[in-house]
């Protein structure tokens, strides 16, 4: 009996209304088709994603209602509605990840056309918590000196950046600890699970290339079964995909000492700092109208000056240790173990590389497959550091290597006009 009941429950779950299920990687379109006399049944609604010329067709039911789910966020989308004896209508829209766009059409007889009315609105009643949705255009026009998603997340008033720990800015949503957020890129979590970084990332800097973001959503305490393992909020990122047009970008950024002042309170200062990064992006069709790719690569290097150090170390703040005293310690240690206790002088260096690859395959009108691959490689010099009254020896430091690799598949299948499967 128990097995039979479980089977019934599983079977019933397949037919749960798609309007009650929120998708985290895709978007939906719904609406009605009507005339002045009532609903239009059997109307053909063709929905085309213009960048890839991918089309799906839906037929309105007895109440004139149609639904298309599992659609790629962004756009533009062209919706064409046609029915026997009625004038065809067109509408253009863009879609937001995890959202439902409502487009309703009021059609007129082909024999007498007075006015055509197309209305559109976004369904937001199913949103729980406070959400900020950010598209690629907003990202491109928002100033950012760090090329980090933190500059974009600040558009949500519940997001604050805290740099008290190790001088690294961390993301707090709704006042919660930075490590209690869930950062997801194309449905895969990129969190600091072991608590090794102050910024909450699994890497030294942003785990996603700034220019590869198609849409970003900041969700404050969303009450949904989709989300778990968070207390503050969820950051959902969808990356760009290829289209029928070849596109490419190159960007170079420099935030080194050439952009810093050379005086502080009237005194000359000499700071050596390197902070450079570059990004490459390229995408297009492998098979036109069917298979597409989009790849991005970025590399960044930062060399920060020592905050505290002995004379001759090039540090920002010189300790009360003379060069002669330091040399006495160095000579004594080298005579015992043959090592320089202070190690190299100058700057501490860290680097990071990000690689993303996305493939979109329109198998047919009913099945669409997306593959995402991401690599993050980085290293950073860690360990005890000198302070105003302490000189840290080089032996207390170590190189922290970081590597994160993820692969994910996302298959969307149209099982029926009102039944969508996402795996």
Please tell me what each predicted stretch does:
Residues 50-53, 76, 80-91, 158, ...:
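A short, solvent-exposed loop/turn motif at the edges and junctions
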């Amino acid at each position: 009996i128990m097995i039979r009941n479980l089977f019934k429950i599983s079977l019933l779950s397949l037919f749960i209304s798609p309007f009650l299920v929120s998708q985290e990687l895709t978007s939906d379109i719904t609406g009605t088709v009507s005339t002045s006399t009532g609903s239009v049944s059997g109307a053909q609604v063709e929905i085309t994603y213009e960048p890839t010329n991918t089309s799906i067709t839906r037929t309105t039911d007895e109440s004139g209602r149609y639904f298309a789910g599992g659609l790629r966020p962004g756009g533009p989308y062209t919706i064409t509605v046609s029915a026997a004896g009625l004038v065809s209508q067109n509408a253009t829209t863009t879609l937001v990840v995890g959202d439902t766009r409502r487009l309703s059409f009021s059609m007129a007889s082909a024999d007498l056309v007075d006015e055509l009315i197309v209305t559109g609105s976004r369904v937001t009643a199913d949103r729980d918590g406070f959400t900020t949705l950010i598209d690629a255009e907003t990202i491109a026009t928002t100033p950012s000196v760090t090329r980090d998603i933190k500059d974009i997340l600040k558009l949500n008033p519940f997001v604050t950046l805290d740099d008290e720990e190790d001088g690294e800015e961390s993301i707090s949503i709704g006042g919660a600890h930075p490590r209690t957020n869930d950062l997801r890129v194309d449905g895969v979590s990129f969190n600091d699970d072991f608590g090794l970084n102050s910024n909450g990332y699994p890497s030294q800097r942003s785990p996603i290339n700034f220019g590869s973001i198609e849409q970003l959503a900041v969700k404050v305490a969303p009450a949904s079964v989709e989300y778990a393992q968070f207390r503050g909020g969820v950051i959902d990122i969808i990356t760009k995909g290829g289209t029928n047009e070849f596109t490419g970008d190159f960007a170079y950024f420099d935030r080194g000492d050439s952009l810093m002042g050379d005086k502080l309170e009237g005194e000359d200062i000499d700071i050596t700092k390197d902070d450079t990064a570059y990004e490459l992006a390229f995408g297009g069709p492998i098979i036109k109208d069917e298979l597409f790719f989009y790849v991005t690569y970025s590399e960044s290097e930062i060399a920060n000056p020592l905050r505290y150090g002995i004379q001759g170390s090039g540090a920002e703040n010189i300790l009360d240790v003379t060069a002669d005293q330091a040399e006495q310690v160095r000579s004594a240690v080298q005579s015992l173990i043959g090592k320089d206790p202070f190690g190299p002088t100058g700057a501490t260096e860290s680097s990071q590389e990000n690689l993303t690859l996305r493939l979109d395959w329109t198998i047919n009108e009913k099945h669409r497959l997306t593959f995402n691959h991401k690599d993050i490689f980085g290293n950073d010099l860690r360990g005890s550091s000198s302070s105003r009254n302490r000189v840290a020896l080089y032996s207390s430091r170590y190189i922290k290597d970081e590597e994160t690799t993820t692969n994910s598949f996302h298959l969307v299948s149209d099982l029926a006009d009102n039944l969508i499967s996402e795996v």
